Amino acid sequence: MKPNFSKGLIPAIVIEEGTKDVLMLAYMNEEAYEKTLETKRTWFYSRSRQSLWNKGETSGNVQYVQSLYLDCDQDSIVVNVKQVGPACHTGEKTCFHYQII
């Protein structure tokens, strides 16, 4: 089974192996998905830069892919990772650290 990239990008929800904490949300195009499968590290597509990026390539805060889950519509994916260092560029463990209610 493979994601449906007919719209170009799919959301990739990244969770931490063990805790299942949601670490971040990013987007993958087909090339990022294939590179993720090939390298077992997360690759995403930057909508602002319009280019691929490898999580942790410059910061060292890499994500090692443990498993991938495809949703029922085949248009979003959950990436289960072993996270090295913080996932968020702010230095927080997760990008979801602002509590609203």
From Swiss-Prot:
Mg(2+) binds at residues 71, 73, 75. It catalyses: 1-(5-phospho-beta-D-ribosyl)-5'-AMP + H2O = 1-(5-phospho-beta-D-ribosyl)-5-[(5-phospho-beta-D-ribosylamino)methylideneamino]imidazole-4-carboxamide. It is found in: Cytoplasm. The keyword Ribonucleoprotein does not apply. One of its GO terms (biological process) is L-histidine biosynthetic process. Keywords: Amino-acid biosynthesis, Cytoplasm, Histidine biosynthesis, Hydrolase, Magnesium, Metal-binding, Zinc. Its EC number is 3.5.4.19. Zn(2+) binds at residues 72, 88, 95. Its cofactor is Mg(2+); Zn(2+). Pathway: Amino-acid biosynthesis; L-histidine biosynthesis; L-histidine from 5-phospho-alpha-D-ribose 1-diphosphate: step 3/9. Coiled coil: none annotated. One of its GO terms (molecular function) is phosphoribosyl-AMP cyclohydrolase activity. It comes from the Bacteria. It is an enzyme of class 3 (hydrolase). It holds the Pfam family PRA-CH. One of its GO terms (cellular component) is cytoplasm. Binds 1 Mg(2+) ion per subunit. NCBIfam families: PRK00051.1. Belongs to the PRA-CH family. Catalyzes the hydrolysis of the adenine ring of phosphoribosyl-AMP. Homodimer. This is Phosphoribosyl-AMP cyclohydrolase.
